[in-house]
């Protein structure tokens, strides 16, 4: 299922009571909200492009083939550089609505 987002779109390819699988396409120069999860545990894999990841106050640059685990409570944000989109695979526990936004460029609810 494709879902349009203000930063690009996501495709949910696996949704069940055990796990969640998504592909995130982040447009060039866009970023997701600064957020954390109370229960959701996720692992990100970079399929295409370069991802800029802000995790617990530090900035990480992930290239194609890199992966990163984000555990509950870790404040994080994914973004794409100005010159190129990034495509990520996310596999996580199934808590799809477990998002607490700390900061959001698009005015969405925290």
At which residue positions do the language-model features occur?
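A short glycine-rich, His/Asp/Glu-containing loop-to-beta-strand
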Residues: 1-36, 40-41
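Double-stranded beta-helix
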Residues: 2-5, 77-110
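Short acidic-glycine-tyrosine-enriched beta hairpin
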Residues: 57-75
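A generic "binding-loop/recognition-motif" signal
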Residues: 19, 30, 39-40, 58, ...
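Short beta-strand His + acidic residue motifs that chelate non-heme Fe in jelly-roll/DSBH
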Residues: 33-34, 44, 53-54, 70, ...
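A short, sequence-level motif marking secondary-structure junctions
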Residues: 39-40, 66-69, 106-108
């Amino acid at each position: 299922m494709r879902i349009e987002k203000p930063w690009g779109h996501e495709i949910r390819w696996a949704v069940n009571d055990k796990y969640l699988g998504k592909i995130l396409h982040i447009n060039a120069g866009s970023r997701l909200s600064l957020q954390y999860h109370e229960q959701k545990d996720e692992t990100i894999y970079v399929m295409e492009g370069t991802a800029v990841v802000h995790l617990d106050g530090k900035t990480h640059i992930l290239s194609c083939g890199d992966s990163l685990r984000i555990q509950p409570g870790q404040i994080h944000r994914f973004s794409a550089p100005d010159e190129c989109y990034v495509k990520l695979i996310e596999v996580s526990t199934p808590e799809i609505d477990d998002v607490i936004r700390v900061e959001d460029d698009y005015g969405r609810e925290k």
